[in-house]
């Protein structure tokens, strides 16, 4: 292998296209990640960190370039194919021809196993199927059919894969740990395992019966390239004697600082000579070694600082080196070499139009001849038609209407044709439904004209503009078509500092807190607002925080924490993330399909229906009676067809809260408060209409009533028109439902005609109503003025509820109850059919002792008029859940948590998730009763988090990134230190939070959390459940402690707790307005002259550093030199680039 020489061509930068101006502020690394030769054409392919694939000819001239992977995911592997090029990213597989036209594109949305992919290879000669594998053990090894573009097979593989290579019979799998498995793709199993390298495999090649590998081993704690390459013979399944490849630092020149012999980093079997292997190191030295006679070799040195990739052409005559900074350079055997492959295909290029004269004369009026065929002369001066914008003074006008007889005739003809179409359809089996004005709004209405100047002003207006904010909070519609801005579906916008850049204050000027939309199932926010201002519900839920209930995940406890946080926040934004996390851990909620962002109408579940499918149908099934298929379908269609996800969740939530209260009071004689508040005692009576005469009665209790349209078989409402009826007949009819069905009798076990009657026997203080009406029924209801009654009177007469608008209409001597509308949830449907929920709540103003109505649209909170709140006539507004309260209950005061005798014992003892273990490592000292914290007690805090999901990004055509949804993070570790006293700086809480979810990234460099630290089976840390730590944190907040830390605002947001500013001492005090924020590490260097965070982060160290910084701040503030000292810190920081030097 002599006569190799460096190519005469200068190295070429393959990342030139990534150095465009619009990418210069992108912090993403710009580099080439993979280089391969084309096996069918004289091309070399390069994939980069932005997901783009480029091809170059032997002169480095660009042939094609295309974006292969959405989201600018880096290319991790490339394979040349007879029909094009195959590229792989971590979550997608892309196949295109050589001209860059996509032939197949598969993402994780198409094949779920496409996750954290690292490598791929063919395993057949026809190249029709490809194997892919990577670092996600859950994905295993997948086989993709390139012809069909589908997943062919999937094989479970327990190890992380780094390299794969095939000899078209077997596949060699290089595992991340350094060993090798031989995989048979026919039987989909590993047939043999080979020992490899002690640390990892860096390169591997497999041809015929020869397998060669290069790897790394640990030497004195550092990874060093092995000085031997491993050779295997797969015929005998054994390793042959390794071949030495060792270069001294002096051999490769002075550009390396290594003190150890240099080993092999890259290798490839020669494509023409089967016993020759090309081996190279990252320093640039490379050899051609004969495996039969290893002493026969030819050493070379590539002149560069370092190389990142090394590959041989299919002809064996070219060597490509990818140098530092993505520069490509080549070696060849002689200057006469013509191409990368021996039988190169002819490349296709685009056609160029010929500038020729028109062969015949074209008339000006000839409409069939395209004007684009007439070329324009070349020019070098500014054309006369290029007038400046200052010439045009008009703002733009509307085109004048063309008047004439022709237009009217056309209108008449079109009207006649439409009438003929309508008559034709009406005579057929299909018919057109009349246009629903109340659902879709008026049509054929011309929008008012807005000049370009007005539009321009609207586009450039900012959220700081008071007028714009006023428009944003406008809740009254200007016409019957447009939806007011206050009802728009809100989206959070994330800036450089995440959600901290978002101005929530512009959406809420009240004292009542809204909720962020940065959670799953955003519709849950409105259900929380629905019950937040019901005094009896609030008082009971918050009172449950008085005692410890941390054994299991409790919806009742989490709702109490959330209600208390929203009260304490006093209008500041809050999150319901912890509440949603607890709901997601409940299997029943998942089975009901509650975790979705789609809130449209659902038709129920297959199989046995549950309570949410209607009062009567669920009760029949509770009696274990068999109903035939026809009857079951009729019941589902009648009672569960228009049930929405929010209504299902409302029923689930109330039932869950009641069941948790019952469980807590199993050994107590106390009354079940929520049952008394919401419980409807329902009697279901079933009478068989035959000689059998079977009669069954079963009482039961429901927490929420499904309100349907009055039944046609109800004598009381059969002759009344609903066009002048309020909601009261709907409620009263739903409290007494009657149905006749054919079902199997439980006594004679025969199909008999049966009567089913479901009757409510009581009137609880709170009525939770799920309004389930059809679109046609809503059309009728919206025409009734005052359909949603503000109040009504009710009584029980003859064991049946009677509801009237006036008390004088109830001619009875029984007790009469007045109910007032407390709150309700409405569904808003925009012009594009997208739906979201808003909540209306009636709240008592303590200053003037009058009730006011407020509208909650997630984090937008606005006071509105009562008439507007009760108006449901708009086509875009539909009530779903309504809460009526007894007039006496609504006037009860809200009880503050501060008046409760809260149990604080958990602050003085351990509560591990798996009990007290002997091998647990404690780095803290528990508080004693003598150290009981009180108002003003300083507590230093730092929290660490792990990432559960990746962020969702949107990238436009210019490469600008927009964060749509940040990565979901979970609390991993929290350390709290004493901030004063004899034990100042000593931790009293150092909790690791157990995590049972999939962790996408441990963020070890920033969190100090290692894999296994949060696993109760493996960890030796003090593991606790999140509920345990949260109660400790909540208790310290209630006791009035003052928290000291760095970046506490973000920590408290992720912990999901609101701490008033008066109880926060953040090291952000070291900040000059208009300047950059200083990191904790740099502040420790600049102020304390100490180094922190030298390795992984440690929350105890970070909390203690923040405490010392705060003490220093108080000292400087007392001397009156803090501002001058801070300016010196910034001046010094500019010299170091705000980075900590290696030595202090």
From Swiss-Prot:
Organism encoding this protein: Kluyveromyces lactis (strain ATCC 8585 / CBS 2359 / DSM 70799 / NBRC 1267 / NRRL Y-1140 / WM37)
Protein name from the UniProt record: PAN2-PAN3 deadenylation complex catalytic subunit PAN2
Function: Catalytic subunit of the poly(A)-nuclease (PAN) deadenylation complex, one of two cytoplasmic mRNA deadenylases involved in mRNA turnover. PAN specifically shortens poly(A) tails of RNA and the activity is stimulated by poly(A)-binding protein PAB1. PAN deadenylation is followed by rapid degradation of the shortened mRNA tails by the CCR4-NOT complex. Deadenylated mRNAs are then degraded by two alternative mechanisms, namely exosome-mediated 3'-5' exonucleolytic degradation, or deadenylation-dependent mRNA decaping and subsequent 5'-3' exonucleolytic degradation by XRN1.
Keyword Cytoplasm: yes
Highest classification ranks of the organism: Eukaryota, Fungi, Dikarya, Ascomycota, Saccharomycotina
Record: residues binding a divalent metal cation: 942, 944, 1051, 1102
Regulation of catalytic or functional activity: Positively regulated by the regulatory subunit PAN3.
Superkingdom of origin organism: Eukaryota
GO molecular function, one term: poly(A)-specific ribonuclease activity
Cofactor(s), names only, from the UniProt record: a divalent metal cation
Ranges: WD repeats: 27-66, 153-193, 196-233, 302-341
One Gene Ontology term, aspect cellular component: P-body
GN (gene name): PAN2
Alphabetical UniProt keywords: Cytoplasm, Exonuclease, Hydrolase, Metal-binding, mRNA processing, Nuclease, Repeat, WD repeat
Domain Exonuclease: 939-1110
PROSITE patterns assigned: USP_3 (PS50235)
């Amino acid at each position: 292998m002599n006569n190799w020489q460096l190519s005469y061509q200068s190295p070429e930068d393959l990342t030139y296209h990534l150095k465009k101006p619009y990418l210069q502020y992108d912090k993403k690394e710009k580099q080439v990640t993979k280089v391969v030769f084309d096996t069918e054409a004289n091309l070399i392919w390069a994939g980069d960190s932005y997901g783009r694939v480029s091809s170059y000819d032997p002169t480095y001239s660009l042939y094609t370039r295309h974006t292969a992977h959405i989201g600018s995911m880096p290319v991790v592997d490339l394979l040349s194919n007879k029909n094009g090029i195959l590229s792989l990213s971590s979550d997608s597989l892309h196949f295109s021809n050589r001209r860059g036209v996509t032939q197949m594109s598969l993402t994780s949305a198409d094949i779920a196993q496409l996750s954290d992919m690292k490598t791929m290879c063919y395993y057949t000669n026809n190249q029709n199927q490809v194997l892919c594998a990577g670092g996600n053990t859950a994905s295993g090894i997948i086989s993709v059919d390139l012809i069909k573009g589908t997943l062919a097979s999937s094989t479970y593989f327990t190890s992380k894969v780094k390299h794969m290579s095939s000899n078209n019979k077997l596949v060699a799998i290089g595992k991340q740990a350094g060993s090798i498995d031989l995989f048979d793709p026919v039987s989909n199993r590993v047939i043999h395992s080979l020992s490899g390298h002690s640390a990892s495999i860096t390169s591997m090649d497999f041809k015929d019966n020869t397998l060669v590998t290069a790897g790394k081993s640990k030497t004195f704690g550092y990874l060093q390239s092995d000085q031997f390459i491993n050779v295997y013979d797969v015929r005998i399944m054994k390793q042959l004697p390794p071949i030495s490849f060792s270069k001294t630092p002096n051999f490769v020149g002075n550009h390396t600082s290594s003190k150890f012999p240099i080993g092999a980093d890259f290798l490839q079997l020669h494509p023409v000579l089967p016993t020759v292997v090309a081996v190279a190191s990252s320093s640039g030295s490379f050899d051609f070694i004969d495996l039969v006679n290893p002493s026969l070799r030819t050493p070379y040195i590539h002149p560069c600082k370092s190389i990142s990739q090394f590959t041989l052409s299919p002809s064996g005559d070219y060597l490509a080196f990818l140098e530092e900074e993505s520069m490509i350079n080549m070696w060849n055997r002689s200057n006469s070499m013509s191409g990368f492959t021996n039988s190169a295909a002819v490349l296709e290029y685009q056609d160029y139009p010929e500038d020729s004269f028109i062969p015949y004369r074209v008339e000006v009026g000839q409409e069939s001849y395209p004007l684009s065929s007439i070329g324009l002369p070349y020019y070098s001066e500014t054309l006369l038609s290029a007038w400046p914008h200052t010439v045009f003074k008009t703002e733009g006008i509307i085109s004048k209407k063309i008047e004439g007889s022709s237009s009217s005739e056309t209108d008449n003809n079109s009207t006649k044709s439409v009438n003929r179409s309508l008559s034709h359809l009406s005579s057929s089996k299909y018919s057109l439904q009349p246009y629903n004005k109340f659902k879709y709004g008026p049509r054929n209405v011309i929008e008012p004209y807005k000049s370009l100047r007005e539009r321009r002003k609207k586009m450039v207006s900012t959220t700081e503009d008071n007028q714009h904010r006023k428009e944003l909070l406008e809740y009254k519609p200007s016409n019957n078509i447009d939806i007011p801005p206050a009802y728009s579906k809100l989206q959070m916008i994330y800036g450089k500092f995440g959600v901290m850049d978002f101005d929530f204050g512009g959406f809420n000027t009240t004292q009542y807190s809204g909720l962020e939309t940065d959670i799953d199932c955003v519709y849950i926010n409105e259900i929380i607002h629905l019950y937040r201002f019901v005094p009896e519900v609030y008082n009971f839920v918050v009172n449950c925080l008085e005692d410890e209930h941390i054994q299991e995940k409790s919806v009742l406890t989490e709702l109490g924490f959330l209600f208390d946080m929203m009260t304490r926040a006093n209008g500041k934004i809050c999150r319901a993330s912890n509440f949603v996390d607890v709901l997601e851990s409940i299997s029943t909620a998942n089975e009901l399909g509650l975790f979705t962002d789609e809130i449209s109408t659902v038709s129920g579940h297959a199989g046995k229906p549950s309570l949410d499918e209607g009062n009567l149908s669920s009760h029949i099934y509770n009696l274990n009676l068999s109903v035939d298929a026809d009857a079951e379908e009729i019941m589902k269609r009648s009672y569960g067809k228009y049930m929405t996800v929010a209504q299902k969740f409302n029923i689930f939530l109330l039932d869950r809260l009641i069941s948790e209260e019952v469980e807590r009071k199993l050994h107590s004689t106390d009354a079940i408060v929520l049952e008394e508040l919401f419980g409807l005692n329902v009697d279901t009576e079933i009478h068989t209409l035959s000689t059998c005469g079977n009669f069954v009665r079963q009482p039961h209790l429901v927490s929420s009533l499904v309100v349907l349209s009055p039944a046609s078989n109800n004598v009381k409402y059969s002759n009344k028109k609903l066009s002048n009826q309020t909601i009261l007949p709907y409620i009263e009819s739903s409290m007494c439902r009657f149905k006749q069905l054919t079902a199997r009798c439980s006594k004679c076990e025969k199909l008999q005609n049966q009567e089913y009657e479901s009757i409510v026997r009581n009137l609880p203080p709170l009525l939770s109503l799920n309004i389930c009406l059809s679109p046609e029924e809503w059309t009728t209801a919206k025409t009734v003025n005052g359909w949603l009654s503000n109040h009504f009177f009710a009584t029980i007469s003859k064991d049946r509820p009677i509801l009237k608008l006036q008390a004088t209409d109830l001619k009875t001597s029984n007790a009469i109850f007045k109910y007032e509308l407390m709150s309700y949830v409405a569904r808003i449907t925009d012009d594009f059919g997208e739906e979201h929920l808003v909540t209306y709540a009636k709240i008592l103003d303590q200053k003037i002792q009058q009730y006011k109505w407020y509208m909650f649209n997630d984090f937008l909170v606005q006071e509105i008029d009562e008439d507007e709140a009760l108006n449901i006539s708009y086509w875009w507004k539909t009530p779903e859940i309504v809460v009526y309260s007894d007039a006496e209950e609504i006037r009860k005061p809200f009880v503050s948590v501060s008046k409760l005798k809260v149990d604080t014992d958990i602050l003085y003892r351990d509560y591990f998730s798996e009990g007290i273990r002997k091998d647990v490592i404690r780095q803290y000292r528990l508080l004693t009763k003598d150290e009981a914290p009180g108002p003003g007690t300083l507590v230093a805090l730092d929290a660490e988090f792990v990432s559960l999901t990746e962020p969702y990004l949107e990238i436009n055509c210019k490469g600008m990134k927009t964060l749509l949804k940040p990565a979901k993070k979970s609390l991993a570790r929290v350390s709290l230190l004493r901030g004063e006293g004899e034990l100042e700086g000593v931790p009293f809480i150092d909790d690791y939070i157990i995590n049972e979810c999939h962790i996408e990234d441990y963020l070890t460099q920033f969190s100090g959390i290692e894999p296994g630290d949060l696993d109760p089976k493996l960890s030796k840390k003090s593991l606790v459940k999140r509920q345990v730590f949260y109660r400790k944190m909540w208790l310290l907040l209630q006791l009035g402690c003052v928290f000291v830390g760095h970046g506490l605002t973000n920590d408290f947001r992720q912990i999901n707790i609101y701490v008033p500013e008066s109880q926060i001492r953040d090291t952000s005090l070291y900040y000059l307005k208009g300047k950059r924020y200083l990191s904790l590490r740099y502040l420790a260097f600049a102020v304390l002259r100490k180094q922190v965070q030298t390795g992984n982060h440690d929350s105890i160290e970070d909390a203690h550093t923040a405490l010392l910084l705060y003490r220093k701040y108080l000292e400087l503030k007392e001397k009156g030199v803090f501002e001058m000292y801070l300016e010196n810190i910034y001046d010094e920081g500019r010299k170091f680039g705000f980075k900590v030097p290696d030595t202090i």
